Amino acid sequence: MELRSELPSVPGAATAAATATGPPVASVASVAAAAAAAASLPVSVAGGLLRAPPLLLRAAEKYPRTPKCARCRNHGVVSALKGHKRYCRWKDCLCAKCTLIAERQRVMAAQVALRRQQAQEENEARELQLLYGTAEGLALAAANGIIPPRPAYEVFGSVCAADGGGPGAGAPAGTGGGAAGAGSSEAKLQKFDLFPKTLLQAGRPGSPQPQPGKPLSPDGADSGPGTSSPEVRPGSGSENGDGESFSGSPLARASKEAGGSCPGSAGPGGGGEEDSPGSASPLGSESGSEADKEEAEASPAPGLGGGPGPRQRTPLDILTRVFPGHRRGVLELVLQGCGGDVVQAIEQVLNHHRGGLAAGLGPTVPPDKAAVGAVGAADDAWPGRVDAAAAGGPGLPAPLQAGPAAPPHHRPLLAGAMAPGALGSLSSRSAFSPLQPNASHFGADAGAYPLGAPLGLSPLRLAYSAAAAHSRGLAFMAPYSTAGLVPTLGFRPPMDYAFSDLMRDRSAAAAAVHKEPTYGGGLYGPMVNGAPEKQ
């Protein structure tokens, strides 16, 4: 009907144009009208044929390129997945297709979680490398259990190579199978070891061999090669509290195993002189403070051959070691008065001695005949005291007497500070006088700590009190010298010292025969029979 209405109108328009314009214009108008009619016919037909059914395109128009529900798709329904999981019609369906979909979703979720965890560990390891450097960051990551994952082919290749001669080849032979299994497990551990033991053993300097002239330890334990136990003795050397933090690292564990065959002085009282260089003090075996030595001896140390461990020191034993010149009964009474507190008891004894010094009454040390006989072999035997003690006698003044019986590595703490000779020089010397000490400083001073003979240095005199500091002309450092923080060097000639490590085995008679050289006048003052003359 549409076409019929459009076709008759065209001739009417053409006749009207023909009557108005004439014959040539009429022919052109008829051709244009026919072309317009022919062009309008295919467009109207194509629009009707290309229309899609509305049901199929409804989800695509509403949710373009969005994920669809797989369960609904299995049952012939297309539904967008966003906000649909809870309200899905087939969420509890147990058909074969839905069960397969559920298993696939579970596997995908596990893979995503694994990738996320690996990415997090890699980020943490990378941060540690940036913070502490490459090698230290890897060591810290390994100590914390964070090891960067290796490529999958490398891990499986090493495991397969280690298992190549494993159960199949080693099972028929009775003991051969166990050895092969142990070898394969050791190869696996060596593959992932950050600190190979061969490098540690090759790069570790050998520890010094024990010298034949070394005496026995105070408790009589022999100095010999250590056992093959991987444990490191806690009380060895000059440990300053960092042993516990170092022992947890993998480097410490490997060094424990590598250091099992190194010689070391074992036993309860064998100090740390023959230990490895890592634990040796830089100033030699004599430079550690008395408190460190006591602490090192009090710490438990395994003996040779699985023997019984050393007993823990009681507070009374600690007091007798700190104050060897006092009677045990007196120290026990002081300890009971302080309620068993060792620190308070030490303070009480020190305060008592300071009060005695202020009153001008220096404490007299009772002579010990055993110490007089063994003073030549002692480590802290000074020349003046050796000669005076060899002559022997209870009438000697306190600074010239031999020290009481004590192990050679443990000296009285405050003997030098409490010497009566220090008081005389204190009263007769100004704080601003030049540093020219009198002859009393060259006598027997038990507070003078000799440095190790291999260093060839003067003895280290620790100023424990203001009196000792004033007597050495160091009054301007009084607030530091009272705390024992300022080491001062003595003015005795270098040839006048006893070489502790080289002349340890000389006897008292040999020490008396070989008189020390005397120095007349000058800086060192006159020496009479090896004893200083009072100025």
From Swiss-Prot:
It comes from the Eukaryota. One of its GO terms (biological process) is regulation of transcription by RNA polymerase II. It is found in: Nucleus. Keywords: DNA-binding, Metal-binding, Nucleus, Zinc. Residues 69-116 bind DNA. This is Doublesex- and mab-3-related transcription factor A2. Residues 200-315 are annotated as: Disordered. It comes from Bos taurus. The keyword Nucleus applies. GO terms for molecular function: DNA-binding transcription factor activity, RNA polymerase II-specific; metal ion binding; RNA polymerase II cis-regulatory region sequence-specific DNA binding. Its main location: nucleus. InterPro entries: DM_DNA-bd, DM_DNA-bd_sf, DMA, DMRT, DMRT5_1_DMB_dom, UBA-like_sf. One of its GO terms (cellular component) is nucleus. Belongs to the DMRT family. May be involved in sexual development. Pfam families: DM, DMA, DMRT5_DMB. Residues 313-348 form the DMA domain.
